[in-house]
């Protein structure tokens, strides 16, 4: 009698596929929030597996701040065509004009928190009752305590004190009219799990995840790449370094890490040796306050 056992990556994959199928069963109008980063790319791969041989039964939604890395945008468009998925793109720039919002000021003027308004408007426009995201619990303490099925009220707000139990992988997606649920199929994955899975499954990624040369300036110990949105001050020293990105956000709030890792194996070896989380090492917007992420999520952020 033969025994069938899953390794840990196969167990994580099976859990995520189960969550995707729960979404399809429980919600009428789900959507997958897609940024062109490694986590949302992994979500698309898992969604294809969950519904194969059919197409992904919901659209990919990208909230474009206008400050995205060009490599991520090019990859987004290519992947949407490759998997034959509907791609919905909404611009933060339009929201700023329509709502007369104030643009962030300062040296690194991140539109990250303004994405919330565009996301909530998009949910209202398409009547989405579920938005699937690529957040993981190892990234940040606010995400660590959020459920896989995270209920948002009619204003898109999250109350961490009112979360539903998820015993025995039973997920409750029942909501009142106007509410919606954010679902995180890879909550239990780590950054290392994601990279090992990408290597095993031979998943394509944007080139910025691997070592390349960029002009950067140093800000509070972080390397911020120069671009049309990030310009040096007179006292900044411009450096040219070999860097890669651990996470992909806006160019104005995402720092690079110094690296020579040009292959998947080399990236994985670097991750194994690091003791700093990807957001802790690279996200400027998370350092605004101690509870920056939780505050954004309470107001409707991803």
Label every model-predicted segment.
Residues 1-302:
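Nucleotide-activated chemistry modules centered on ATP-dependent adenylation/adenylyltransferase
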């Amino acid at each position: 009698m033969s025994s069938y056992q899953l390794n840990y990556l196969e167990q994580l994959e099976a859990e995520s596929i189960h969550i995707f199928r729960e979404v399809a069963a429980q919600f009428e109008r789900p959507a997958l929030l897609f940024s062109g980063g490694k986590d949302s790319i992994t979500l698309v791969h898992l969604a294809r597996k969950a519904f194969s041989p059919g197409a992904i039964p919901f659209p990919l939604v990208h909230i474009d701040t206008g400050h995205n890395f060009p490599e991520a945008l090019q990859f987004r468009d290519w992947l949407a065509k490759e998997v034959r998925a509907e791609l919905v793109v909404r611009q933060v720039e339009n929201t700023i004009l329509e709502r007369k919002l104030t643009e962030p000021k300062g040296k690194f003027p991140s539109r990250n928190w303004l994405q919330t308004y565009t996301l909530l408007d998009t949910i209202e426009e398409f009547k989405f009752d579920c938005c699937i995201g690529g957040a993981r619990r190892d990234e940040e303490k606010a995400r660590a305590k959020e459920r896989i099925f995270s209920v948002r009220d009619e204003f898109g707000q999250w109350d961490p004190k009112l979360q539903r139990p998820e015993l025995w992988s039973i997920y409750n997606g029942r909501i009142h009219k106007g509410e919606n649920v954010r679902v995180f199929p890879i909550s239990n994955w780590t950054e290392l799990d994601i990279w090992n899975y990408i290597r095993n499954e031979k998943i394509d990624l944007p080139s910025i995840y691997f070592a390349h040369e960029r002009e950067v300036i140093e800000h509070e110990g972080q390397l911020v790449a120069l671009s049309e949105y990030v310009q040096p001050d007179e006292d900044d020293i411009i450096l040219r370094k070999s860097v890669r990105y651990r996470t992909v956000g806006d160019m104005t709030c995402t720092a690079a890490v110094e690296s020579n890792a040009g292959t998947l194996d080399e990236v994985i070896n670097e991750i194994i040796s690091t003791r700093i989380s990807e957001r802790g090492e690279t996200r400027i917007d998370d350092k605004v306050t101690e509870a920056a992420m939780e505050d954004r999520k309470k107001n409707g952020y991803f």
